[in-house]
Each structure stands twice: as C-alpha cells, then as structure tokens.
Curated annotation (Swiss-Prot):
This protein's name: Small ribosomal subunit protein uS15
GO biological process, one term: translation
Key words, A-Z: Ribonucleoprotein, Ribosomal protein, RNA-binding, rRNA-binding
A Pfam entry, by short name: Ribosomal_S15
Lineage: Bacteria, Bacillati, Bacillota, Bacilli, Lactobacillales
GO MF annotation terms: rRNA binding; structural constituent of ribosome
GO cellular component: cytosolic small ribosomal subunit
Gene: rpsO
Family: Belongs to the universal ribosomal protein uS15 family.
SUBUNIT field: Part of the 30S ribosomal subunit. Forms a bridge to the 50S subunit in the 70S ribosome, contacting the 23S rRNA.
Amino acid sequence: MAISKEKKNEIIAQYARHEGDTGSVEVQVAVLTWEINHLNDHIKRHKKDHATYRGLMKKIGRRRNLLAYLRKNDVNRYRELINSLGLRR
C-alpha cells in the first residue's frame, strides 16, 4: 500500500522547514522512513515477496544517501532529524 495523501501531508507539515516545503532533505527522509517502516512490516508478513524487498532496499539506499548529504552539509540538522525520527546513528 502506498502512502496516503493525508499521511504524506501530515509528515510534510511536521518536517517542513518553511511553508510549501516538500523537497528539503528532512521531508524526503521523513517520508522515506515512513515508507520503509511500512514495507518492513509487509516483508515480515510476506517473506517471499522479493520484489517488495528489492524496493525496500532501494528506499533504504536513497535514505542513506540523503542522510550522508545532510551530515556532510549541516551536522546539527542531521542530528536533530535522526533524533526526531528515532534512527540509530
């Protein structure tokens, strides 16, 4: 199941840096984290769904790259984001 428009707007409102912000690293990572958590639950129930597993790995890689970019450019924003999302780093 894809992320609903309402849920996505809720996440965007929470992590946006300014009004109308949908593309900042924080927003992208927050949306990816929600999708990753949702796919993780799906994979736990459907262990042989290899196509979904591949999509999950692609999303994890995308999030990893965005977090590396944020860490390189603004360490304070990076730390705030991983603390608010509860990511282990």
